[in-house]
A protein has these predicted regions:
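Extracellular/oxidizing-compartment recognition motifs
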Residues: 1-274, 290, 306-307, 311
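Short, solvent-exposed loop/turn segments at the edges of secondary structure
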Residues: 64, 99, 218-220, 289, ...
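The feature captures the catalytic groove of carbohydrate-active enzymes
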Residues: 208-211, 318-334, 367-430, 434-504, ...
Length: 652
């Protein structure tokens, strides 16, 4: 038999499962579907392929839809063996489904649903069919994701205030077993002990299903059953997850950093399922800005291109584009920059050609929302986010224009890469950066201001960080920004792990590795000191411990397991272990290890889809063992080639 996959209209699988993900939020007993435009999948599609058959062959088509198989001018039912050939045979599969996206599975020696099928929706030009490595058997249903499962017993069971407190794992389906028959008990769940023992304010409280004893899946580290003695009810946690292998490992001579890496990895894996989601507790939604940072961590931890691509397709939706992604202006821009970063890491030409028209239409949508100066502005019902921070958002926001400019440059490069003319994007980039300098650069302050329309000339870190990160500021301006903004304690500090990611990335690029490592130890280590087992959505060290879980006006509103807080993996891997992917001129990756920050190190990192590289440092000798092609080791001015399977040893 040929290798078959379930196939569908490209993007529909992601839109369908993305819809289910974004409709999964439940809070204190009520459902809360995501508050942005929900993109629909196609209900009527046709699959086509023409074969040149040397001899007679047979095949069978399975589908979740109604429809038929057309071979020549004869129609056949799904599930029936079809015999055809020899000669030219045109196969068409016509499907319609109201409940979900139509998909088919073609089983046969020669005619099978592998790469080569095209699909059309009777509206746009045919496209190569979509598929997934997770759906390769005829008895599967691509509309139902088959999760891996692992059952965890509680790590502790204690009596508290007349009830029973269980400590368990995160993001699980709780299963209750009753010693004396079913009881309609209330199970209060929490990411923290404080939340679980507060039945009034906890986010999740359930009565187990009478037949199965199960509760809905939720973020649960602690579970509390009031008015229940230990032993009367037995709880287990059934963790459902997508089994994406971790390719990286990290161990150094400092326990603090090892623990930070481990907790960041645990945090990130919990937020990595069918898609990258923000966190496992509150939203469980697919946010573009959160996903953008997840692409960076993914490259250095799992290097799984598929989850990147599923997330990208679920976020963008269909053309024409009528609303910003997640309603947020900057999240539309970060979607495009995320495609650029993904392409840099994995270089999947087929995926790039699939998504390129969506990139073009997104830029066209944004270009239609400019003011008289050419600045991108928020229209009615658009959310200009950037960060949870006080900044002057009167009129065009400088930080937004930095992202907008970066998108023009990314579009130029990607257009040229796939044989399109990128000059129009270069011209737009040059025009926009010129007016950014004219209206937002303040020479007296030595920094970019938030807004020029309010007259306040307010300076925050955000626009200035983006100016360096995307190379919009020149070298002299960057030095001024470093002094006047990044190293200036009078400029309000960043308090979210989300924007700490951007700030620390800039500091690393400017050679401030000591400061970055100290920040990783203190900021992420500060969460560990407060008992964190996963990293949080937000952390302000100045806030009293009893108020740390407060957010959005809710006593337990803060997510304590948030993907954007896993960024230490990226910093330690890229800037300290020193791995950078380049994919240019025959060089796949460059390794610039900074061993002066470690007493010892044993680290394995993925090199895109190309393999892995291992670094072992004992304080004197550095051993590099690559299982990837095209590597260069840079030690100061010295450049040494790295050959797959050969260990290189150097004294440092």
């Amino acid at each position: 038999m040929g290798k078959s996959y379930w196939i569908w209209y490209p993007g529909d699988f992601e839109l369908y499962h993305g819809m289910k993900q974004n409709f999964s939020r439940v809070e204190r007993g009520f459902g809360w579907p995501a508050f942005w435009k929900s993109e629909g999948f196609r209900n009527r599609v046709a699959f086509r392929r023409t074969y040149q058959l040397e001899k007679e062959t047979s095949f069978t088509v399975y589908s979740n839809a109604i429809g038929h198989v057309l071979v020549g001018d004869k129609k056949y039912s799904f599930g029936k063996k079809i015999v055809c050939g020899p000669g030219e045979v045109a196969v068409g599969v016509h499907t319609g489904c109201i409940e979900a996206f139509p998909c088919i599975y073609v089983e046969g020696e020669v005619i099978c649903s592998d790469k080569g099928w095209i699909v059309e929706d009777y509206d746009k030009e045919p496209l190569p069919a979509g598929k997934s490595k997770y759906f390769t058997e005829p008895n599967q249903n691509p509309t139902v994701w088959e999760y891996s499962e692992k059952v965890y017993e509680p790590v502790s069971v204690t009596e508290y205030n007349g009830g029973t407190l269980f400590e368990t794992e995160l993001n699980a389906v709780l299963e209750a077993e009753f010693k004396n028959g079913y009881q309609p008990v209330l199970i209060c769940c929490g990411e923290s002990r404080e939340e679980a023992i507060d039945p009034v304010h906890c986010y999740y409280s359930w009565q187990p299903d009478k037949e199965t004893g199960k509760c809905p899946c939720c973020a649960v580290r602690f579970a509390y059953i009031p008015d229940c003695k230990p032993g009367e009810v037995i709880l287990r946690a059934n963790h459902q997850y997508v089994d994406i292998p971790v390719k990286a490992s990290f161990h150094c001579g400092e326990d603090r950093l090892n623990q930070i890496w481990s907790v960041a990895e645990h945090t990130f894996r919990l937020c990595s399922g069918i898609f990258f989601i923000d966190g496992v507790k509150r939203d469980k939604w697919i946010w573009s800005g959160d996903a953008y940072q997840s692409f960076f961590v993914n490259r250095y931890l799992m290097a799984d291109a598929d989850i990147d691509q599923r997330t990208i397709l679920a976020l963008r939706g269909n053309d024409p584009m009528t609303k910003h992604i997640n309603t947020i202006v900057d999240y539309s821009l970060l979607w495009l920059l995320g495609v650029d970063y993904h392409n840099e890491g994995y270089g999947d030409r087929d995926f790039l050609e699939l998504v390129y028209p969506k990139m073009v239409s997104l830029m066209g949508f944004c270009n239609g929302r400019r003011d008289e100066h050419g600045f991108l502005i928020g229209k009615e019902k658009d959310w200009v986010y950037i960060d949870w921070a006080d900044m002057d958002k009167d009129g065009p926001l400088c930080a937004e224009q930095m992202l907008y400019a970066a998108c023009f440059r990314a579009m130029e490069e990607i257009s040229e890469q796939i044989g399109k003319d990128g000059s129009v994007y270069r011209a737009e980039y040059e025009k926009l950066t010129a007016v950014i300098e004219k209206f937002f650069w303040d020479e007296e302050k030595g920094a970019y201001i938030d807004s020029f329309t309010s007259g306040r000339r307010n300076v925050t870190r955000h626009a200035n960080i983006f100016a360096i990160l995307f190379s919009i500021a020149d070298e002299k301006q960057q030095e001024k920004i470093l002094k006047n903004v990044l190293e200036n304690d009078e400029i309000p500090a960043i308090t979210t792990p989300y924007f700490n990611f951007f700030e620390l990335d800039v500091l690393c690029r400017m050679g401030k590795l000591t400061e970055v490592l100290d920040k990783i130890r203190s900021y992420w280590g500060g969460m560990l000191d407060l008992g964190a087992v996963t990293f949080w959505e937000e952390y302000d060290p100045s806030v009293p411990k009893e108020e740390q879980y407060d957010m959005y006006g809710d006593h337990f509103g803060k997510s304590l397991c948030h993907a954007w807080a896993a960024s230490p993996i990226y910093f330690l891997a890229k800037y300290f272990a020193g791995l950078d992917l380049v994919n240019k001129d025959g060089v796949t990756y460059i390794l610039k290890p900074q061993m002066q920050y470690f007493t010892e190190l044993d680290c394995t990192l993925p090199v895109g889809s190309n393999g892995v590289v291992r670094l072992v440092w004992d304080g004197e000798i550095l051993e590099i063992t690559p299982n990837a092609d095209g590597g260069i080791l840079e030690l100061g001015e010295q450049k040494l080639s790295l050959v797959r399977g050969e260990t290189r040893r150097v004294n440092i």
